């Protein structure tokens, strides 16, 4: 019925006396990353096969900006529920490193750096007081995080680099 996929904590029509509640939809998040054009080509794949596979497996929405001849980088936008976005980034690293999607990262797995674009106003909550939050994320994930000191030219955003194997990037 209409509206069932929207945030709702209201009783729905039911034949029983007890009100029933529909599942609340998680708030979608949007994360953007700078990627080099060669990685963008790998992520997209022939006729979009790779990007469609990542979309299906993660349930996240993925979009890659058009290539600009003077710029070696493109913007990857990943949106959806937090777990879908996290999974998508893990799958993206696996695609770049040419590792199978269904196996855990191995000690010999290649580490990749994902460069997230974070609003300067949000960077404090990522880093935490005296770097506590960023250290927690690093310890929990095994990835290395590095917050850019300066804002990107002509913007109010900074780069947060995450370096690690696919599983570490997924967790971070």
Model-identified regions with their sequence ranges:
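Long, charge-patterned amphipathic alpha-helical coiled-coil/hairpin "stalk" segments used as oligomerization
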Residues: 126, 130-136, 141, 148
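Low-complexity, intrinsically disordered regulatory regions of RNA-binding proteins
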Residues: 1-42, 50-121, 139-144, 148-172
């Amino acid at each position: 019925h209409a509206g069932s996929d929207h945030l709702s904590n209201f009783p729905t029509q039911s034949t029983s006396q007890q009100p029933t509640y529909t599942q609340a939809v998680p708030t979608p998040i949007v994360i953007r990353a700078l990627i080099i054009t060669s990685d963008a080509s790998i992520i997209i794949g022939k006729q979009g096969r790779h990007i469609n596979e990542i979309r299906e497996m993660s349930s996240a929405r993925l979009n890659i900006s058009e290539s600009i001849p003077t710029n070696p980088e493109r913007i990857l936008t990943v949106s959806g529920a937090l777990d879908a976005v996290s999974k998508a980034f893990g799958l993206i690293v696996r695609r770049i490193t040419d590792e199978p999607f269904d196996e855990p990262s191995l000690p010999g797995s290649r580490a990749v750096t994902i460069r997230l674009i974070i609003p300067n106003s949000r960077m404090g909550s990522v880093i935490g007081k005296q770097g506590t939050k960023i250290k927690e994320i690093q310890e929990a994930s095994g990835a290395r995080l590095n917050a850019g000191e300066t804002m990107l030219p002509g913007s109010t955003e900074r780069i947060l680099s995450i370096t690690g194997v696919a599983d570490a990037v997924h967790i971070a």
